[in-house]
């Protein structure tokens, strides 16, 4: 509630949004009553609370001619620490863990928060085999084969279509490797349900579980699903579902 009231005062666009909804911040007594800001506002405005110059701007992916979301960052180190905390809460320390990132669609553009996070994880790991892999699947496959039986389970984090490419071209048992998909076919393949995707990857790499990461430009926190698609949010993330046409109305469980 303190954060809400701060933003209601210092975020000009959010203050206008509350005014249009005729919501008096002083009357909001419970977190469940906080009005949610539509994602569309991140596309139309540069949102920030207070007066400061951004040190970095995260942008969402999008096709030519389509407006993308922008999220301004005032402190890069805060984002790094927050992302590390969310990951390490579920998986333990990044230090000495091999981190192999397969994020071709994201590496090909600027402003990706996922690439920024993965870059920090790679540096934080301090492992000589950690790094990004754009399209060099043979080298990635060789590294995974060498690391799969190591003392620390390696992390393979990748966009869905690229992991499917790896599964088709270089299927192999990956032992205790943490294989983590970040979603996204990016128009490269047909869309698949998460259970279908995980089934294909589990069979190709002979692992019991495929892990999932969820994040978005408009959020500065992540959620992770170690198994069964059940996402566990970071301490700084509280998810609530609202009606797409009414930011004050909650959506009942089981509805969309």
Predicted regions and their residues:
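Active-site glycine/GP-rich loop and adjacent strand/helix microenvironment
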Residues: 1-6, 10-13, 96-98, 105, ...
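Active-site diphosphate/adenylate-binding microenvironment
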Residues: 9-59, 67-72, 82-95
């Amino acid at each position: 509630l303190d954060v809400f009231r701060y933003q209601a005062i210092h975020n000009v666009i959010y203050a206008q949004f509350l005014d249009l909804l005729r919501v008096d911040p002083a009357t909001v007594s419970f977190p469940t009553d906080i009005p949610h800001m539509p994602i569309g506002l991140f596309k139309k405005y540069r949102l920030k609370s207070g007066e400061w110059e951004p040190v970095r701007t995260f942008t969402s992916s999008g096709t030519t001619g389509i407006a993308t979301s922008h999220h301004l960052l005032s402190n890069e180190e805060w984002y790094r620490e927050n992302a590390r905390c969310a990951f390490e809460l579920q998986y333990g320390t990044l230090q000495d863990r091999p981190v192999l990132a397969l994020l071709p669609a994201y590496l090909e553009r600027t402003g990706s928060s996922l690439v920024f996070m993965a870059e920090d994880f790679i540096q934080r790991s301090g492992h000589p085999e950690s790094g990004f892999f754009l399209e060099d699947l043979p080298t990635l496959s060789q590294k995974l084969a060498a690391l799969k039986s190591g003392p620390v389970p390696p992390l393979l984090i990748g966009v869905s279509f690229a992991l499917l490419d790896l599964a088709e071209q270089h299927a192999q048992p990956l032992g205790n490797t943490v294989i983590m998909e970040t979603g996204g076919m990016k128009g490269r393949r047909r869309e698949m349900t998460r259970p279908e995707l995980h089934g294909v990857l589990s069979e190709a790499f002979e692992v019991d579980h495929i892990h999932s990461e969820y994040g978005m430009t408009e959020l500065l926190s992540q959620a992770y699903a170690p198994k069964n698609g059940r996402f566990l949010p970071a301490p700084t993330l509280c998810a609530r579902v609202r009606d797409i046409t009414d930011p004050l109305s909650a959506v009942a469980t089981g509805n969309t």
